[in-house]
């Protein structure tokens, strides 16, 4: 298999067929980092914010906060997964239709979503949720002391407690990052086994794991290449955001004040957020197209050659 030709073909598909961009946006839908940066600035810029957070943690409505926040996070995770599933399902079906010599249409996307989006959603939940829970477990030893200190209006945390929390966070990084890469590869193959072969949810996951075991060399070779491409795009976004933040902080022209008391041109942040989502859309469309081409050329061709 020529990986350069596969990636060039994926590039041509993304550049030529703009209908894919809509579903690439859905597949890669996530809050832009510019929004996270703005929220972080809001928390640190207002001198009253620590006191407000303390009141929320220990005030009369604290029970509602401790119960409602996890439920809200779970609901956000499910909504996010559902939106992503719609995009992934349509992208796989449309790229496959292109490779069969037919034009991609919204009708094809709709039929694929009606038939397979529910299964794709379950695949994502079954693979991502355990990883998310494990990540949370590793963060708890550091997060709990921080929340306790905020609730008790303390500015310091005992050194051994911090060291223990940092140890578990570092251990979690060493475990979660390789696991997330492996799960991503299983998910990509399982998605295509579901949409292109019509497999059930659990059968698709089992097939994705079996395909990695049987064809680990090609899967790893493509996966590392795509991981590098996504990493470069992510690094570009992070560097651009930091440059923008520095430019805003040094701007001599009186910047606008936000409702949180944070100074910063909202128009610039909004523009950057849109640009970030555009880059993420293109990258997600390219990655999905590459995996679909890989699945067709290697795994489906292997099956067709089997007696």
Labelled PLM ranges:
Residues 1-307:
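Hydrophobic alpha-helical membrane segments
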């Amino acid at each position: 298999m020529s990986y350069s030709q596969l990636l060039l073909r994926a590039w041509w598909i993304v550049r030529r067929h703009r209908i894919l961009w809509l579903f690439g946006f859905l597949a890669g839908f996530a809050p832009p980092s510019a929004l996270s940066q703005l929220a972080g600035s809001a928390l640190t810029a207002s001198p009253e914010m620590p006191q407000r957070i303390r009141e929320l943690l220990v005030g009369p409505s604290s029970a509602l906060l401790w119960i409602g926040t996890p439920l809200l996070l779970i609901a956000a995770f499910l909504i996010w997964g559902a939106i992503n599933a719609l995009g992934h399902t349509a992208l796989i079906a449309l790229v496959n239709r292109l490779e069969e010599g037919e034009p991609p249409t919204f009708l094809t996307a709709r039929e694929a979503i009606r038939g397979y989006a529910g299964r794709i959603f379950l695949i994502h939940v079954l693979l991502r949720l355990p990883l998310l829970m494990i990540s949370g477990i590793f963060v708890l030893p550091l997060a709990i002391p921080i929340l306790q200190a905020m609730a008790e209006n303390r500015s310091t945390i005992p050194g051994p407690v911090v060291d223990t929390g940092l140890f578990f966070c570092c251990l979690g990084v060493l475990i979660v990052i390789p696991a997330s890469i492996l799960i991503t590869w299983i998910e990509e193959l399982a998605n295509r086994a579901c949409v292109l072969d019509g497999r059930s949810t659990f059968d698709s996951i089992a097939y994705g794991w079996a395909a990695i075991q049987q064809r680990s060399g090609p899967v790893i070779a493509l996966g590392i290449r795509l991981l590098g491409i996504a990493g470069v795009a992510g690094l570009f976004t992070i560097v651009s955001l930091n440059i923008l933040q520095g430019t805003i902080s040094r701007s001599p022209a009186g910047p606008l004040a936000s409702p949180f008391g944070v100074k910063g041109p909202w128009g610039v942040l909004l523009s950057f957020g849109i640009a970030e989502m555009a880059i993420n859309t293109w990258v997600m469309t390219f990655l999905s197209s590459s995996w679909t081409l890989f699945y067709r050329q290697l795994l489906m061709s292997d099956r067709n050659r089997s007696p």
